Design a protein with these regions (language model features):
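Two-component/phosphorelay signaling modules centered on CheY-like receiver
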Residues: 11-29, 116
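Short amphipathic alpha-helix used as the core "switch/output" element in two-component signaling
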Residues: 61-73
Length: 119
């Protein structure tokens, strides 16, 4: 199916995303460090990036902007535990296709991943 990156500064959140989406047949690569995820996206095929907005060194929106430079066609879903209209607007304006509110809901994540990958 799809090659997916999951970037969250909380290791368990990445593991949860991997468990949910691997059952749907996707290959999920989890990261807790922004630079590692960006580097991976530059050198590997990635269909979808699932990025937490609040990270350690930079925001998920900054990470998305860097990934878009390397892979303009990459699709993205932003994760946030602090949803605001501003954050949603900024994420969408930078090319995020969707966003999910944490804690992650399995059905919502599966539905949004499916929708974004269909284009």
């Amino acid at each position: 199916m799809a090659e997916i990156i999951a970037l969250d500064d909380v290791h368990d959140a990445g593991i949860l995303i991997k468990k949910i989406l691997s059952k749907k047949g996707h290959n999920v690569h989890t990261f807790t460090e922004e630079e590692e995820a960006i580097s991976y996206a530059r050198t590997n095929k990635v269909d979808l990036a699932i990025l937490d907005i609040k990270l350690k060194k930079m925001s998920g929106i900054d990470v998305l902007a860097q990934m878009k430079k390397a892979l303009p066609a990459i699709r993205a879903i932003m994760l946030t535990g602090y949803p605001t209209v501003e954050t949603a607007r900024e994420a969408i304006s930078l090319g995020a296709n969707e966003y999910c509110i944490k804690p992650i809901d399995k059905d919502e994540l599966e539905e949004k991943v499916s929708k974004v990958l269909r284009g």
